């Protein structure tokens, strides 16, 4: 029975239908992978603003997505307010609540929070410290809503991690002193007389970061669900529950020691006595820094260190010849100091020494050498910029592409430039062997003896030429590899657009052969329609047209109502599929029956194409 059903299905289903279904499934999977984002991706926040006499706290309840609480919203807000921090000795001025809905948080901030809707017992309640209200502050709903939105965005930036639990403690403030004029935080160690604040810890996991610019951040540690009383501290805020209390105490002791050092340095009087050389009378300058007052005058005297003594003649003769040559190169005087219309050019010698020179871009290479180098007798100065030898002295620096701050390598030797008329490089062939050039092509022999030091230059040029030849061969191989892919891609494209109608007979034989083979393969399998009057073929084409057209209409409607789901890649794929639908499926549906004259012309053109392929 099963075999009969399978056989019937195979007889009923056509290969084109199976291929179309597979393409649809592949497109659906690709679209899901590209746009794996929910169409309605948003986050719900309930924000409560608690305004106290000298403080302002914001409670943020991150509900996630599609939150359906089992309790009423009034009960939820009551539970939030019951878990608000209570401060002894202060009066709560006002409470305002705001509902925040942020759609597509990736457009607001790159949120590391997962897209989920947590249960009621796993919801994270955040307490955020806000800037305290100023004197005579009147509660403003607009400003409170702005604070609420900022708090919600801050939660998105931090991520939704329900395992965090921390506490923040408000430092004790003391009145401003005369020398600072600003409010300072008392960073002394806790004592029995220091003020203490009681905080109520509830059974809901929450964190208490601070975005108040006027208050210092604090270190957060794990606490238990017990009411705790903590003295003021001075630490840096960080969500690191692994830190222990010992580290907190050590950091507090280090801060106290730094404060003691700062107080002792403020009360000290600095006296500097500097002596200036080259003057008859020695002047002594005494600088006193009063407490909290500005420094009136500070004199800086640069002490120049004595340069190393020059080398003796015996030591110079003992050095190797190469080191001596590098020393001579670095001893060439270079004119330093900028002037009007000149740019900075850095000269780098072979011994890794650099000197700054200033020249105009309109100066020639010869003028640059004359201005910045002396003792040119029996010396050849080679300037190299970006791997290019500045050989032509009559060209300007601007023609060689020099810019302000360019680095020019300088090589000084006694080897002259190679003459253009002398063939110094043998021809390089693919087999790697050298071949002597013919005498008819060889340049006339020069009677001038070549110095012995020119051999390394020739070897260097030969190496460079071989390297360029190898690079050219690699480029040729890469081009050959890429050119082999062109007929395949072109053949696939021509198969869809009926290559039997091609009138251009000058195409390569390989391209036509492959395209014709692909076309015949697709026609034999029923993927392309032949020019016959078979009613079944027309029925299959009509069915494929209506299926494809309905899918394109559905995707277009979805794109119109949910444009946020599509990104650039998905939209590009949609455009490609739409163009294929218009130029292939729709045009095939509207294709009229050919006339007998056109059929005869097409047969003649096909015969001409086949004969041309055979001749090629």
UniProtKB/Swiss-Prot annotation:
Q: Give the compositionally biased regions (Polar residues).
A: 221-237
Gene Ontology terms: biological process: ERAD pathway
Q: Which Gene3D superfamilies match?
A: Phosphatidylinositol 3-kinase Catalytic Subunit, Chain A, domain 1
Disulphide connectivity of cysteines: none
Q: Which residues form the Ubiquitin-like domain?
A: 343-417
- Sequence ranges of Acidic residues compositional bias: 272-287
**Region called Disordered, residue ranges:** 166-243, 272-298
**Ranges of Basic and acidic residues compositional bias?**
184-200
A Pfam match: ubiquitin
For this protein, the record's SUPFAM superfamilies field holds: Ubiquitin-like (SSF54236)
InterPro entries xrefs = TMUB1/2 (IPR040352), Ubiquitin-like_dom (IPR000626), Ubiquitin-like_domsf (IPR029071)
In terms of PANTHER family, this protein maps to: PROTEIN C7ORF21 (PTHR14557), UBIQUITIN-LIKE DOMAIN-CONTAINING PROTEIN (PTHR14557:SF5)
Protein name from the UniProt record? Uncharacterized protein B0303.4
User: Which species is listed as the source?
Assistant: Caenorhabditis elegans
Organismal lineage: Eukaryota, Metazoa, Ecdysozoa, Nematoda, Chromadorea
